[in-house]
């Protein structure tokens, strides 16, 4: 693996047993993602895009091959160490926001910092600044049930960015957003890829979003190909 890559996988594969049959979902995948790079993965429904994100993010175990995140081979780490690495080096935005319903927007964004033992005043200050950056400075005290779908997604994106990770993975990040808000998220990603050298890996059906990335990869037949 290149020591400059924030994410790398080699010969990555995933299969499932269905009775006597082995169903191959992904096979022989190769990928390197470098600081500041923005890559989109596109493909039809059921092609394995979400499975791939889960493997790359250490949320699932591959059947073959290896994944390296921030210089660490995920399969060589225990569950606790893997969780700490994800919290430090990776931000993840799901298609559905997965915000904690009992906490406010500010508290949700603070959570990764508090897990990493950042002092509460500093965590609140940094989370407030980031929520203001995504246009939600006036919604800090609102719980997810009091926010629109687009607002909840922006809170989730802020939460993914709060630790200033080297890599952010996003699963259909603009699917619930109007055009203006979606463009704002795209602009923020572009800015961070330049100013902070944050890398972004995005799974999307939105080709207008994919075309704004540096590279587009298509997942078909269980393999990644340049689109």
From Swiss-Prot:
**GO BP annotations, alphabetical order:** lipoprotein localization to outer membrane; protein localization to outer membrane
Answer whether the UniProt record assigns the keyword Nucleotide-binding to this protein: yes
Give the enzyme's EC designation: 7.6.2.-
Domain ABC transporter as annotated: residue spans: 7-227
Q: Which UniProt keywords apply?
A: ATP-binding, Cell inner membrane, Cell membrane, Membrane, Nucleotide-binding, Translocase, Transport
Q: Name one GO molecular function term.
A: transmembrane transporter activity
Q: Binding positions for ATP?
A: 43-50
For this protein, the record's PROSITE patterns field holds: ABC_TRANSPORTER_1, ABC_TRANSPORTER_2, LOLD
Query: Record's InterPro entries?
Result: AAA+_ATPase, ABC_transporter-like_ATP-bd, ABC_transporter-like_CS, ABC_transpr_LolD-like, LolD_lipo_ATP-bd, MacB-like_ATP-bd, P-loop_NTPase
Mind telling me which GO cellular component terms the entry cites?
A: plasma membrane
Q: Enumerate the subcellular locations listed in this protein's record, separating them with semicolons.
A: Cell inner membrane
Top-level EC class = translocase
Summarize the subunit comment: The complex is composed of two ATP-binding proteins (LolD) and two transmembrane proteins (LolC and LolE).
Q: What's the family?
A: Belongs to the ABC transporter superfamily. Lipoprotein translocase (TC 3.A.1.125) family.
NCBIfam families the UniProt entry points to: LolD_lipo_ex
Q: Which PANTHER family match?
A: IMPORT ATP-BINDING PROTEIN, LIPOPROTEIN-RELEASING SYSTEM ATP-BINDING PROTEIN LOLD
The job of this chain, per UniProt, is described as: Part of the ABC transporter complex LolCDE involved in the translocation of mature outer membrane-directed lipoproteins, from the inner membrane to the periplasmic chaperone, LolA. Responsible for the formation of the LolA-lipoprotein complex in an ATP-dependent manner.
Indicate what this protein is called per its UniProt record.
Lipoprotein-releasing system ATP-binding protein LolD
Q: What is the lineage of its organism?
A: Bacteria, Pseudomonadati, Pseudomonadota, Gammaproteobacteria, Pseudomonadales
